[in-house]
């Protein structure tokens, strides 16, 4: 996106958007541990000489030292379930949070949201799960991998609502980097309601991928 020649040589594409309680989102709306970490970073940045990775690391430490996980009630295209969860992500795009491949096979123009819920686990298991999640190793060929199945739930949907079900107050959520405590969060798909300009290489890949999907 920093190459102006490539930008002008590219093209515009239509993508799906999510309408959420935090505003319109083009990529991922998440709640739980990862959102709590992101929400806490600005507080540490106010400390002198504490910015960037240091603020991120301190926010993680604070979250891990506190109560981990929430009981959350989900309504996913009419399906209702209550889960003790570490965190969850409603995905229109593939990555967020500095390179976490939350939804390795998501497409922003296929008319679906990929929903991943990570069950609450002990502190010793969190690092392993986050490593799997960051590398996108929890999902392959349209399904959860065997190593992910004990810990992850997966759905495809067009409307997702969630609310805390443990009486502990609001849950922290994030959408495209905007964080806030919420009493409830809803994400509703708005098919092909956004348009973005892609630089030439990305535009060519996007069009080729869309063509291959249409052929199938």
Region spans (language model):
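Glycine-rich, charged/polar anion/phosphate-binding loops
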Residues: 57-61, 70-77, 97-103, 144-148, ...
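Catalytic core of DAGKc-family lipid kinases
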Residues: 1-87
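Short acidic/glycine-rich loop or secondary-structure boundary segments that cap or lie
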Residues: 34-37, 82-84, 96-99, 123-127
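ATP/nucleoside-binding phosphotransfer catalytic cores, i.e., glycine-rich phosphate-binding loops
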Residues: 76-77, 82, 107, 117-216
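Gly/Ser/Thr-rich active-site loops/lids in small-molecule metabolic enzymes
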Residues: 45-55, 98-99, 104-127
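Glycine-rich phosphate/pyrophosphate-binding beta-alpha loops
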Residues: 30, 34, 89-104, 178-179
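A short catalytic or substrate-binding loop motif that flags glycine-/basic-rich loops and adjacent residues
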Residues: 10, 64-66, 109, 154, ...
């Amino acid at each position: 996106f920093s190459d102006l020649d490539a930008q002008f040589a590219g093209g515009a594409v239509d993508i799906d958007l999510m309408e959420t309680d935090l505003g319109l989102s083009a990529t991922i709306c998440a709640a739980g541990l990862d959102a709590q970490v992101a929400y806490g970073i600005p507080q540490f940045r106010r400390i002198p000489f504490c910015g960037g990775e240091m603020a991120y690391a301190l926010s993680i430490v604070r979250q891990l030292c506190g109560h981990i996980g929430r009981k959350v009630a989900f309504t996913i295209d009419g399906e209702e379930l209550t889960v003790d969860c570490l965190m969850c992500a409603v995905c229109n795009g593939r990555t967020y949070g500095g390179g976490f491949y939350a939804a390795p096979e998501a497409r922003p123009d296929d008319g679906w949201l990929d929903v991943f819920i990570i069950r609450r686990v002990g502190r010793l298991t969190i690092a392993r799960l986050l490593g799997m999640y960051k590398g996108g190793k929890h999902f392959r060929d349209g399904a959860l991998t065997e190593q992910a199945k004990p810990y992850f739930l997966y759905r495809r949907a067009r409307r997702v609502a969630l609310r805390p079900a443990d009486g502990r107050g609001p849950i922290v959520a994030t959408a495209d980097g905007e964080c806030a405590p919420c009493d409830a969060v809803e994400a509703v798909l708005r098919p092909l309601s956004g348009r973005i300009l892609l630089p030439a290489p990305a535009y060519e890949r996007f069009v080729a991928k869309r063509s291959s999907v249409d052929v199938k």
